[in-house]
Amino acid sequence: MVEPGQDLLLAALSESGISPNDLFDVDGGDAGLATPTPPSVQQSVPLSALELGLETEAAVPVKQEPEPMSTPALLNVRQPPSTTTFVLNQINQLPTLGSTIVMTKTPPATTNRQTITLTKFIQTTANTRPSVSAPAVRNAMPAAPSKDQVQLKDLLKNNSLNELMKLKPPANIAQPVATAATDVSNGAVKKESSNKEVARIWINDMKMRSFSPTMKVPVVKEEDEPEEEDEEEMGHAETYAEYMPIKLKIGLRHPDAVVETSSLSSVTPPDVWYKTSISEETIDNGWLSALQLEAVTYAAQQHETFLPNGDRAGFLIGDGAGVGKGRTIAGIIYENYLLSRKRALWFSVSNDLKYDAERDLRDIGAKNILVHSLNKFKYGKISSKHNGSVKKGVIFATYSSLIGESQSGGKYKTRLKQLLHWCGDDFDGVIVFDECHKAKNLCPVGSSKPTKTGLAVLELQNKLPKARVVYASATGASEPRNMAYMNRLGIWGEGTPFREFSDFIQAVERRGVGAMEIVAMDMKLRGMYIARQLSFTGVTFKIEEVLLSQSYVKMYNKAVKLWVIARERFQQAADLIDAEQRMKKSMWGQFWSAHQRFFKYLCIASKVKRVVQLAREEIKNGKCVVIGLQSTGEARTLEALEEGGGELNDFVSTAKGVLQSLIEKHFPAPDRKKLYSLLGIDLTAPSNNSSPRDSPCKENKIKKRKGEEITREAKKARKVGGLTGSSSDDSGSESVSDNDESDYESSKNMSSGDDDDFNPFRDESSEDNEDDPWLIRKDHKKSKDKKKKKSIDPDSIQSALLASGLGSKRPSFSSAPVISPASNSAPANSNSNSNSSLVTSQDAVERAQQMKKDLLDKLEKLAEDLPPNTLDELIDELGGPENVAEMTGRKGRVVSNDDGSISYESRSELDVPVEILNITEKQRFMDGDKNIAIISEAASSGISLQADRRAKNQRRRVHMTLELPWSADRAIQQFGRTHRSNQVTAPEYVFLISELAGEQRFASIVAKRLEGLGALTHGDRRATESRDLSRFNFDNKYGRNALEIVMKSIVNLDSPMVSPPPDYPGEFFKDVRQGLIGVGLINVEDRSGILTLDKDYNNIGKFLNRILGMEVHQQNALFQYFADTLTAVVQNAKKSGRYDMGILDLGSGDEKVRKSDVKKFLTPGYSTSGHVELYTISVERGMSWEEATKIWAELTGPDDGFYLSLQIRNNKKTAILVKEVNPKKKLFLIYRPNTGKQLKLEIYADLKKKYKKVVSDDALVHWLDQYNSSADTCTHAYWRGNCKKASLGLVCEIGLRCRTYYVLCGSVLSVWTKVEGVLASVSGTNVKMQIVRLRTEDGQRIVGLIIPANCVSPLVNLLSTSDQSQQLAVQQKQLWQQHHPQSITNLSNL
């Protein structure tokens, strides 16, 4: 029975998502060691845990009422608290622990407030270490309850929650009685944390914790107790499995080895009942391989079913690069064409891929299907005469062209209307969304709106409900947000567990890594998803470290200093001229975008010499080279060309250009004289014709929006106009411009909420070569969105300024030509006012002008050392354009002529138009005319450069990357250019990495992924070291959490979790603080000088980009500090049992996995009724004496063999078997009798402290004893004689040799909400959904959800008594059979 008032607290906590049952789990390290008799310890936990705004400095001892059984011992407390300690704990379980809740009223010296403490009693161990002498104080006499003690229920009745929180403690709390626990030599007592530490630990805990259903009892750790970390499930041995179609036996084998993730391979797809119409010739000649035919068949089969809302079901192809998605799609279109569905739509990311689409259709024997480009049609009916009367075939379009619109009006003035008319209302043909993850975000993050492209894709599907939709994306089901417009998969919506897409996203993202695996498996199970990847067997890679020369480091550090000065000047100038908020936002957006690109260019430039060297060597060895770049730096070249009047005297420094362009265009200092002379205005002449209405304009004439010259702007717009769509400069790792047609509207809509570095097209002025999208691409519809301008006399100067976006109606800089409402009613200023304002603003502007000039002068000095454009330098060093095939988005290049002069030339050739230049260059490379190819990321999507059996050039490809993306998925996508099906030889990959921040780490993460896919490293130099480096990927919640701790510790908001790098010369925190101020991640308050963190301070991407702007030794030390903190965060999470390991692997190591029971349940589904199975699995992980002696017999090292612990506990010793695995570092592998092979390696020095070497006979008794008892006795009971958890009737599995798991498999998605309901009701809302992969002894693979033991019976009841769902499933099955009479024979085994 809940006492009155308790419901207040419970409600408050449940709102915070905290389960009262689990509020204060005590970690093993936190409990003090107590007296030899089993006492109960009182522990108070600080209120800051509840994030209720109060702070505390120590735990508070509380008097307790006498108990019949045990004697209390108090926890050691060093100092009285400064604030209320208020602990809510296990209200409904307290009586079972024999505890009493008391409130002490202490006579206060300075205050009349009450002290409230709610405590929890914890029983601790009965055994002290033998080395500790018996304590002098055996027991502290418990005080009888005094008059001052008040029961909690009375307290809760009389106070509101708010009042309880305000109560202050008295100043004079007595020191607690000392016990053996105060003996520091014990090593088990944790030091009191400071209030900041406690707050941090609790806040992080709340973020990460998974609440367990049962009360956790503390494990008291002794100093020398061997750590038995239960990490057995961490083995991720086999991630990928060989793939062959299971249910379909037609077609020839695929030319290359293909793999599938092992979780997907554990699921079998549905039976095939659909018969394809594709000709025997196509199949027998292998034009479509067996696995491509399988995808075509399943897609066609899925298209025969309808979702509950009446739409036709869609199919998702998740094949990776090189498996032949193009041919599979062509096969689906061909299949439907043969069935008289002769119209199809194919959307992709680049117009160049149209040629690939034509090739794929031709290759499978569908020569008669024509492919038309949407952008080549005029607006109007596609089937009309002026569009060539196109009645059938495939219309190929890019996503961005979907939102195209004609200014001339008419019935079909948008591309979408054209397509809808061409298809017709009853359209049941194929719509393919290729690379659909690139179609801009429909499900935006934060405050931004969905993009027009995303909405158009959705509208197209909604308007054509009978269309056969195919989604194709290599990252299809790995990123749930990318699935926003895959509404035809039937995962969310009517008749599914998730009503809306947002419900699905919440459920999946809340459940972590494994949830998407469950979704993918469920989709494969239902026949709507297929995902294979090319095996990387045969591929080799090496990591080539490029050492930075002293002169390079010097130059880099100079550049860093210049950027720090630039940041200060930009800030000062903006303050001087009182820049408007919107202008500042735009300015900083541009500043950080330029900052990121500048340092990326410097990083790449450091590797050019080495690349050239390696490339020449490989060519000599008879191989050919592909060099991958992210960006081309074209915009910089064009600017330099214009400044030199079309003449160049040297290669252009891209890095210099970035900073120069930033200062010239975006420094807040208008060049007034130039502007007015250009407009023909005499500043000194008084304006005669200005009416009172216009007088405010006088002072404003002087102001303009940004310091650009209007004519130069217009001139440049004309000049650069043709380059708008090019992917030239900003295909950087976070750029939005993935598409060949940059979708300005969409990009402006994207994440408008904040100025992060990643979107160069965000702010009012666009990037680089698109100086102003409005000037280049006049888009009349956009002007409708702008606020209505106040009518202005067209002859006035102001209107000229406004028209060119340079005027403003306010005496401050406006970043956009929008007039604020305030200016409409502004009173006319008097002349004197106007003049004085003119003088001060002129003075400020002149000072800003001077700053701008100084910055440009400093840049010129530095420019002598800055490296030239990487791409031009590479081409020049490797023999010029005649030897190098360039596949990038740029239109021209800088070349050195025979006479040594430098000139700019267009890339286009006489007989080759610019549009197909890249395809021509690719052909030259594939034909062997050129043996070196340089590709930029944007231009290369979909281009195949492998050593194809059909190509003339069959030399082995060596693919070099100068810039690794820090996401392994993106890297694998890049490598898909040279590693594809039907190749003679697999490529070699070379990662060039410098010693700049974290490049080594990126490389090792990518290397680890490649190894998982079957690639080999050159030599074994990396075998041990880099595995440690890549052990934890950092773009996850632990990475963000570690970064938060790092940043807070640097500004003293938090105490550091790890010590700074020992080899750092100087004061680490002080230097790094200055460095981070310089890159804008720490802000300094103007007046107070207080340091504050940037609002995105825990954004990993931003952090990694920004720290490149710190001096070399600083950024490396900071990255090392971050990596160390991350390791500590992960270790802590593991120790507290809250580490989200993603997917657990059982049975891939030495464990023996057996199925002991299985229960099946029918579940409803829209196409077929599915079923779920609940397996009872027993896992045996120990090592018998026979197995141990077998390993022992093979050991050769001097220190290998059996060891016994020096310490005796409960009259027992620990026996272990030790094997040396790394002689250089003296690392040893340990085997234990109860838990088998340990994942954690031990250093020899640590081993010697705890163990001594013995002969095998001495170890035998101890080994057998622990092996036999661990079958059913946990570690605590074995070493201490009792286990507190077991004594409370709870299950304890720590150290058990045999464990039991309950795993729910099958169509889990259809019962997801039921499972969540049961888990939440038993275990609280934040229970972690743990996915497990099992491989049983008989070779069966099982992947599913672990169900906690205490949730099994309610779940079984729910699933089995759900008669309604079973009946519904049977009805659906019958209905389905009526729709598909031809398939009844095939359904008997469904």
Curated annotation (Swiss-Prot):
Query: Is Nucleus found in the keyword set?
Result: yes
Q: What are the GO cellular component annotations?
A: nucleus
Provide ranges: composition bias, Basic residues.
Answer: 778-790
Query: Which InterPro entries does this one have?
Result: P-loop_NTPase, SBNO_Helicase_C_dom, SNO, SNO_AAA
Enumerate the Pfam families for this protein: AAA_34, Helicase_C_4, SBNO
Compositionally biased residues, Basic and acidic residues:
695-714
> Which biological process annotations from GO are given for this protein?
negative regulation of canonical NF-kappaB signal transduction; negative regulation of MAPK cascade; negative regulation of neuroinflammatory response; positive regulation of canonical Wnt signaling pathway; positive regulation of neural precursor cell proliferation; regulation of DNA-templated transcription
* Keyword field contains S-adenosyl-L-methionine: no
Record-linked PANTHER family: PROTEIN STRAWBERRY NOTCH HOMOLOG 1 (PTHR12706:SF8), STRAWBERRY NOTCH-RELATED (PTHR12706)
Function, in words: Plays a crucial role in the regulation of neural stem cells (NSCs) proliferation. Enhances the phosphorylation of GSK3B through the PI3K-Akt signaling pathway, thereby upregulating the Wnt/beta-catenin signaling pathway and promoting the proliferation of NSCs. Improves ischemic stroke recovery while inhibiting neuroinflammation through small extracellular vesicles (sEVs)-mediated mechanism. Enhances the secretion of sEVs from NSCs, which in turn inhibit both the MAPK and NF-kappaB pathways in microglia.
Similarity section:
Belongs to the SBNO family.
Q: What does the further note read?
A: Expression is down-regulated in Reln-null embryos. Expression in P19 cell line was up-regulated by treatment with Reln.
**Name this polypeptide is given:** Protein strawberry notch homolog 1
